[in-house]
């Protein structure tokens, strides 16, 4: 492939595009000012249309990567975690930095808008560009199918490790990786424990694609505080990298990208991306590691490449959700993950619901409980109706199923979002109870979004206004 070129930030244009990934690059300090820089990868629906200005380059590269910058306020700099972070590591300090950076995203008018629709290929933006810098974004109100579909690459990665003599640390025994792209296939196998993947050691065929053909370093020039700053980022021949599901817990992907980071940035001491990984702490949800900066690409996980839905999500953001939300970013993260925006419930509905139920409540009908055990007994012949309500999300939520989304919202939402969710859930419970009264049904129990209703077997019950699956039985014990 050709030599990496440079992208300048001095040509004004407009472009229609969907956003496939947003990642942090780094902080830049200059003349007592601090700038945050984000990397935005897009799926172009129309090529940029030049307005005014001139480019510093005669033939700029056709990249899908653009940048957004933001000058920090003093209050935001004061909130920056003051620990001396190792910018190629993991841990609690890194998690605090990631959440602080997410608070910046939530405040930035462009990044916050793009983040809420990132991964949704049906959300097309009109982007106002100044070279490689995104200066403004407007969501197109007329929905239409994308003109260009996202391009996917596939990676299988596996590592084996064993404990050291002291049993305190893991030592890498082997690392294997295969990446299939439209450029060709890259294969790496290392049984020596070394993590650096230079192409001369891994090539099984002379014509095999090299790792830097797939992750191609390219210099980008942006203007920060009146000075031109160069940053090396990677161009890739895909919009999303799909990796095997075991990389959620296997350390292979972390080791591979750590080695690639050192290969590209080992000799660079200036402005460059960070290498931060947040491992999921809440194992009750099928979430994945979150790479907040390098490799600055969208990563999805799939147990079977053939059955992969070819959709993108932001479910990996769940790795940085915490119950102690000191940076007030949980609600922003949840909206990015689920695509759910919850408005306040109208006053008339809120006052008519009666009892308030928290989202995800579990309740049994006390009138049907016999004895001290929490069991409901129905002795007469009846028809059991199970109604399951699902959240109407704007786009795919990745590994999170429809049943897990309300549980995630119930656990991590705060403030007005939690209040609105609880109000709407209370109204849902009230509506189901009211429906039971109108149609001679008896409510048995509800658990999260599942409602269990019963009627006498001889009763004729009209079709509920929601999907119900009847199960006929003569004696039901829940």
Curated annotation (Swiss-Prot):
Give the signal sequence positions.
none
Family from the record: Belongs to the herpesviridae BBLF2 family.
Official protein name in the record: Uncharacterized gene 40 protein
What GO annotations for molecular function exist for this entry? Answer: ATP binding; helicase activity; hydrolase activity
Q: Source organism's superkingdom?
A: Viruses
**InterPro entries the record matches:** HSV_HEPA
Instruction: List keywords of the entry alphabetically.
Output: ATP-binding, Helicase, Hydrolase, Nucleotide-binding
Q: Which GO terms describe its biological process?
A: viral genome replication
One Pfam family per UniProt: Herpes_HEPA
Organism listed in the record: Alcelaphine herpesvirus 1 (strain C500)
Gene that codes for this? Answer: 40
The answer to whether UniProt assigns keyword Hydrolase to this entry is yes
């Amino acid at each position: 492939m050709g030599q990496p070129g440079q992208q300048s930030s001095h040509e004004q244009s407009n472009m229609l595009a969907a956003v496939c990934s947003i990642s942090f690059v780094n902080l830049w300090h200059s003349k007592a000012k601090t700038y945050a820089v984000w990397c935005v990868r897009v799926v172009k629906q129309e090529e940029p249309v030049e307005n005014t200005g001139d480019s510093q380059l005669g033939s700029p590269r056709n990249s899908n990567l653009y940048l957004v910058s933001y000058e920090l306020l003093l209050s935001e700099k004061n909130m920056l975690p003051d620990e001396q972070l190792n910018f190629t590591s993991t841990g609690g300090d890194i998690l605090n930095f990631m959440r602080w950076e997410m608070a910046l995203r939530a405040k930035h008018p462009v990044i916050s808008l793009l983040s809420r629709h990132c991964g949704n290929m049906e959300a097309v933006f009109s982007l106002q560009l100044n070279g490689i810098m995104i200066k403004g974004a407007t969501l197109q109100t007329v929905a239409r199918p994308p003109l260009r579909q996202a391009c996917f690459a596939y990676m299988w990665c596996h590592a084996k490790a064993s404990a050291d003599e002291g049993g305190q640390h893991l030592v890498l025994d082997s690392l294997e990786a295969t990446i299939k792209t439209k450029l060709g296939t890259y294969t790496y196998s290392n049984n020596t424990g070394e993590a650096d993947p230079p192409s001369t050691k891994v090539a099984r065929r002379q014509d095999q694609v090299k790792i830097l053909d797939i992750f191609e370093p390219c210099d980008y020039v942006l203007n920060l505080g009146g000075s031109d700053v160069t940053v090396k980022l990677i161009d890739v021949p895909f919009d999303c990298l799909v990796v095997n599901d075991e990389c959620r817990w296997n350390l292979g992907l972390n080791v591979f990208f750590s080695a690639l980071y050192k290969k590209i940035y080992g000799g660079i001491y200036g402005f460059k991306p960070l290498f931060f990984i947040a491992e999921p702490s809440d194992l009750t949800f099928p979430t994945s590691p979150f790479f907040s900066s390098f490799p600055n690409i969208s990563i999805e996980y799939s147990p079977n490449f053939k059955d992969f839905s070819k959709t993108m999500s932001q479910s990996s953001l769940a790795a940085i959700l915490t119950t102690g939300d000191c940076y007030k970013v949980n609600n922003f993260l949840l909206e990015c993950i689920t695509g759910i925006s919850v408005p306040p419930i109208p006053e008339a509905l809120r006052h008519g619901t009666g009892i308030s139920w928290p989202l995800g409540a579990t309740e049994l009908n006390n009138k049907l409980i016999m004895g001290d055990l929490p069991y409901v007994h129905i002795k007469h012949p009846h028809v059991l109706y199970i109604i399951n309500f699902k959240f109407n999300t704007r786009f795919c939520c990745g590994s999170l199923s429809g049943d897990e989304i309300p549980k995630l919202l119930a656990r991590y939402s705060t403030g007005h979002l939690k209040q609105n969710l609880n109000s709407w859930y209370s109204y849902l419970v009230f509506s189901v109870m009211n429906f039971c009264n109108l149609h001679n049904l008896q409510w048995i129990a509800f658990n999260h979004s599942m409602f269990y209703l019963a009627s006498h077997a001889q009763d004729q019950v009209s079709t509920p206004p929601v999907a119900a699956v009847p199960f006929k039985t003569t004696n039901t014990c829940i």
